[in-house]
Swiss-Prot record:
Coiled coil feature spans: 412-435
Annotated Gene Ontology cellular component terms: cytosol; gap junction
GO molecular function, one term: GTPase activator activity
Functional summary from the UniProt entry: May play a cooperative role in NF2-mediated growth suppression of cells.
The protein, known as: Small G protein signaling modulator 3
Domain RUN: 552-715
Subunit structure, interactors included: Interacts with GJA1. Interaction with GJA1 induces its degradation. Interacts via its RUN domain with the C-terminal region of NF2. Interacts with RAB3A, RAB4A, RAB5A, RAB8A, RAB11A, RAP1A, RAP1B, RAP2A, RAP2B and PDCD6I. No interaction with RAB27A.
Subcellular location field: Cytoplasm
Database matches in CDD domains: RUN_SGSM3, SH3_SGSM3
Gene for this chain: SGSM3
Residue numbers bearing the Phosphoserine modification: 403
One Pfam family it belongs to: SH3_1
SH3 domain sequence ranges: 477-536
């Protein structure tokens, strides 16, 4: 740079991109060196002001910003993977995106050489690809936004000098970074009208401008908004970052249980502190040297790093937090954590040790779930716009097109359906609610003990937290009971007589053929094959829900409830154009159930955890809602395929199993949490891909208050004739064994 002042090596402003060097201040430095006068302020290599008395105590003082051996390792990697021609390797020969590999990740984790950050950040984040593919150049976007006098533009002007007041580049109106920051923020507000301006974007953009040229910083911001962070992160509602705070709280329960108990005990709302960390991606929260290391990884792996780094920070200070005496001390310690961290290697090592196994899929699943809970808590389910989800940020004048293969297989989106989706969704929910109420009224009319059941759905956040607790807390203290399948006449005093459908309390099952039971104050033995053990692990048997006793419940469930639920599952189901018809929800359920249960197959640890978590079946096998769904689907397939039953029949039978197990609402949550499967089978405007599924879950939860005993095979034709045959088989051997010849077997 001819005629300009250049910072000294490792001196003030030396880490900035050359176009950001503040020439006036550098000129004063040059004059002061000649006159041996002390300057008014001292600045570090990043341009941040340092008080004179603290100049010798600056964190990281004396440390080199770039490690020469690390730079050589990066050069060797780039040479090996990109230089296929003889000659020197230059940046224009390196692809716009770097192929992902464990080697590249290890290099990123160890740190990007500072002199390479502008070029590598653009490639790691996908910003360079975005810049090359854009129909509008940054210059054109700036031109379009320069005359855009909006509320956002006025707010940007107010915040320009507030964004980074301690940095020489942004401290004054004449600062070299101020006009750049203005143009970048106005361009972003113009390009993303649904976002406009958010103070979080200003903080991130200002930090990027310290190290990248203006247009590159803009495209980096586009990559952050569109790809690295979920949508609605910087919207006026801050819905995305609020959702991530709930996800973080869930992860703390999993990874830092001691800290979780402490926060609960002192009723501390962690999001009051950490929301700002996430909103600015740690910009202005941690020291700039530490920020650079975090951003190296953030631009490579995305928002997953925000969770890992936060968990790592909390873990490093966990012992100190546990020893805190009161809530105020805990809150202050939490607030001070970022400013007290200096060692990037220590933080990243702890973050990877603690949460290195955390995956983007797991985070996205939790995001979808907690977003739905958040919207349900705010009462924004019905009629919510399609953009409520966190799937995509919409640019001005741009629309993402489908690939040719996707369009050919599943057709184009039905625009009319998207326009009318709110009306359709309301009708579907109303039909389901009416079907549920009809079933509930049947129980209350048939069995008076159900009259006090609350039929109004609970939409609160706490209700979702209680779902799994209720599922786990099965009642085991009461005696087992059985339902009589046939009349059994009492001949001797030690026999227990009963009529068909009587409910018998089982006293002893020591003998496999003869059990001892009680009925109406009498105790005696009876043939075990003449009764059916009731599943009352989490419910008390009711004749109103037994289709063998009360046939009316079959019509209500299979004839009214199942069609209403099927209509919801069919809403937005993609229609394959090549096959000429809609896919059936049963196919989606099969795939989703298989995908969800596969996650446990390869993990011994997960099965050990499950043993402490969920209820057991009769054999002591652990059954999570996912495993229960998978088993039910397989069971229905085995029995129904043999009878050549249609998928409609299978779906109705599966719903009956879910009602029996009181998990129909949890199964819906399992299905909707299988993001890849849902996105494959359903349109973006469908119920299952919108937060509206949480309302359906709340409606279905009402049904778990009632005890169903529905036959899975009720619609199978051969079942009716076979039911009576096996009941008396083996009874004669049992009577011989117990010398009870007085009973007429053939009677």
């Amino acid at each position: 740079m001819s005629g300009s002042h250049v910072p000294s090596a490792n001196g003030p402003f030396s880490a900035l991109t050359p176009s950001m060097w503040p020439q006036e201040i550098l000129a004063k430095y040059a004059q002061e060196e000649a006159t041996v006068e002390q300057p008014e302020f001292r600045y570090d290599e990043f341009g941040f002001r340092v008080d004179k008395e603290d100049a010798d105590g600056i964190p990281y003082s004396g440390q080199l910003l770039e490690d020469p051996p690390q730079r050589l390792r990066w050069q060797a990697h780039l040479e090996f993977t990109h230089n296929h021609d003889v000659g020197d390797l230059t940046w224009d020969k390196i692809a716009v995106s770097l192929p992902r590999s464990e080697k590249l990740r290890s290099l990123v984790l160890a740190g990007v050489p500072h002199s390479m950050r502008p070029q590598l950040w653009m490639r790691l984040s996908g910003a360079l690809q975005k810049k090359r593919n854009s129909e509008l150049s940054y210059r054109e976007i700036v031109k379009n936004s320069s005359n855009d006098e909006t509320i956002a533009a006025k707010q940007i002007e107010k915040d320009l000098l507030r964004t980074m007041p301690s940095n020489a580049c942004f401290a004054h109106v004449s600062g070299v970074g101020v006009p750049r920051l203005r143009r970048v923020l106005r361009a972003l507000a113009w390009l993303y009208p649904e976002i406009g301006y958010c103070q979080g974007t200003g903080m991130v953009a200002a930090c990027l401008l310290l190290f990248l040229e203006e247009d590159d910083a803009f495209w980096m911001m586009c990559a952050i908004i569109e790809d690295l962070l979920p949508a609605s992160y910087f919207s006026t509602t801050l819905l995305g970052v609020q959702t991530d705070q709930r996800v973080l709280r869930h992860l703390i329960v999993q990874y830092l249980p001691r800290l979780d108990r402490l926060l609960q005990e002192h009723d501390i709302e962690l999001s009051l502190i950490t929301l700002h960390w996430f909103l600015t991606a740690f910009a202005s929260v941690v020291h700039i040297r530490l920020l650079l290391r975090l951003w190296d990884l953030f631009f490579y792996e995305g928002s997953l790093v925000l969770f890992q780094a936060t968990l790592g920070m909390l873990r490093l200070k966990e012992d100190e937090l546990i020893q805190s005496e009161n809530s105020a001390s805990i809150f202050n310690t939490l607030s001070d954590i970022p400013s007290q961290l200096e060692d990037a290697d220590l933080l990243l090592a702890e973050a990877m040790r603690l949460a290195g196994s955390l995956t983007a899929v797991a985070v996205e699943t939790q995001r979808r779930k907690h977003l739905a809970y958040l919207l349900a808590d705010q009462g924004q389910l019905l009629g919510a716009p399609a953009t409520t989800g966190l799937s995509q940020v919409v640019r001005r004048r741009t629309q993402r097109r489908k690939s040719g293969i996707t369009s050919l297989l599943f057709g184009e989106d039905d625009l009319e359906a998207m326009k009318a989706k709110n009306i359709k969704q309301t009708e579907l929910v109303a039909d389901l609610r009416e079907a549920i109420l009809r079933v509930a009224r049947h129980f209350q009319c048939t069995d008076p003990k159900n009259c006090n059941v609350e039929l109004t759905p609970d939409y609160s956040m706490e209700s979702h937290q209680r779902d799994h607790e209720s599922y786990v807390a099965c009642s085991r203290g009461h005696p087992r009971r059985a339902k009589a399948l046939l009349d059994f006449e009492r001949h001797d005093d030690d026999e227990l007589g009963f009529r068909k459908n009587d409910i018998i309390t089982i006293v002893s099952q020591k003998d496999e053929h003869c059990w001892v039971g009680e009925l109406n104050g009498l105790r005696g033995w009876f043939p075990a094959k003449f009764v059916e053990v009731l599943d009352e692990r989490s419910k008390e048997y009711s004749i109103a829900g037994d289709d063998a006793v009360t046939e009316g419940v079959t019509d209500l469930v299979r004839g009214t409830l199942c069609p209403a639920l099927k209509a919801l599952l069919e809403h937005g189901l993609k229609k394959p154009s090549l096959l000429g018809g809609a896919c059936h929800p049963w196919l989606f359920i099969e795939e989703a159930a298989g995908r969800e249960v596969e996650r446990d197959f390869d993990s011994v640890y997960s099965r050990l955890v499950l043993c402490k978590t969920y209820r057991l079946d009769e054999d002591g096998k652990v059954l999570t809602p996912e495993e229960l769904l998978y088993r039910a689907v397989q069971s229905v397939n085995v029995t129904h395929d043999a009878a050549h039953a249609q998928m409609d029949v299978k779906l109705r039978s599966l719903i009956c199993v879910g009602l029996n197990e009181q998990v129909l609402h949890l199964w819906l949550e399992v299905l909707c949490s299988s993001l890849p499967t849902v996105e494959k089978w359903y349109q973006p405007w469908s119920f299952l891909r919108s937060p509206g599924w949480v309302q359906i879950k709340c409606e279905l939860r009402v049904l778990c208050c009632f005890a169903f005993s529905l036959s899975q095979d009720w619609e199978l034709p051969a079942k009716r004739e076979e039911e009576k045959k096996p009941l008396k088989e083996g009874v004669q051997d049992m009577l011989v064994k117990h010398h009870l010849f007085s009973w007429d077997i053939d009677g």
